[in-house]
Curated annotation (Swiss-Prot):
It comes from Homo sapiens (Human). A motif (WRPW motif) lies at residues 221-224. Does not bind DNA itself but suppresses both HES1-mediated N box-dependent transcriptional repression and binding of HES1 to E box sequences. Also suppresses HES1-mediated inhibition of the heterodimer formed by ASCL1/MASH1 and TCF3/E47, allowing ASCL1 and TCF3 to up-regulate transcription in its presence. Promotes cell differentiation. Residues 147-161 have a biased composition (Low complexity). Residues 96-129 form the Orange domain. Residues 1-31, 147-205 are annotated as: Disordered. Residues 8-25 have a biased composition (Basic and acidic residues). One of its GO terms (biological process) is cell differentiation. Residues 181-190 have a biased composition (Acidic residues). The gene is HES6. Transcription repression requires formation of a complex with a corepressor protein of the Groucho/TLE family. Interacts with HES1. This is Transcription cofactor HES-6.
Length: 224
């Protein structure tokens, strides 16, 4: 009678057999997996041929040529999208600049008609608004506002507007002793406050092109 085999040896033998079976299954499945992979590649290439059929793709092209044409087409689409984004950003920047300039004009009109505001304070306020003008250095947006920023800022009397940018609206005479000084915006004549875009077209940069003051008033960006 043969002695019984050790339990450890039986376990090692079964593991070796399982390992050989696993490796054998992998070798048997490898050709099938490779065949499926090639079929997927060929199917995708055929779909690319159909998608590009209306363009320069001919009836018979090598797979490498199909891939090259696909890469060119994708690159063209990406460049087009980038140009569209840049154009939208430029248009938004122009609208923001036009709105900012119009708001500065309205502030200038108010501080010019309000006798209670000191001339120095008004000049500092307007100069601060000019220095805070939204500019993007190195882009066409800076050229867009170049005409509006021409000349160093100064504080000419009551207006406090830089040289070359004064709207030209006359300063009203001081109110009588019984009048309140700038008690409320509603007490100021609406014509004086609403005529700012019409009196100061030179404040709008010439680089805005064909944009008129009325168009700017309708399309400007406002923070409220």
């Amino acid at each position: 009678m043969a002695p019984p085999a050790a339990p450890g040896r039986d376990r090692v033998g079964r593991e070796d057999e399982d390992g050989w079976e696993t490796r054998g299954d992998r070798k048997a499945r490898k050709p099938l997996v490779e065949k499926k992979r090639r079929a997927r590649i060929n199917e995708s290439l055929q779909e690319l041929r159909l998608l590009l059929a209306g363009a320069e793709v001919q009836a018979k092209l090598e797979n490498a040529e199909v891939l090259e044409l696909t890469v060119r087409r994708v690159q063209g689409v990406l460049r087009g999208r980038a140009r569209e984004r840049e154009q939208l950003q430029a248009e938004a920047s122009e609208r923001f600049a036009a709105g900012y300039i119009q708001c500065m004009h309205e502030v200038h009109t108010f501080v010019s008609t309000c006798q209670a505001i000191d001339a120095t304070v008004a000049a500092e306020l307007l100069n601060h608004l000019l220095e805070s003008m939204p500019l993007r250095e190195g882009s066409s947006f800076q050229d867009l506002l170049g005409d509006a920023l021409a000349g160093p800022p100064r504080a000419p009397g009551r207006s406090g507007w830089p040289a070359g940018g004064a709207p030209g609206s006359p300063i009203p005479s001081p109110p009588g002793p019984g009048d309140d000084l700038c008690s409320d915006l509603e007490e100021a004549p609406e014509a004086e406050l609403s005529q700012a875009p019409a009196e100061g077209p030179d404040l709008v940069p010439a680089a805005l092109g064909s944009l008129t003051t009325a168009q700017i008033a309708r399309s400007v960006w406002r923070p409220w």
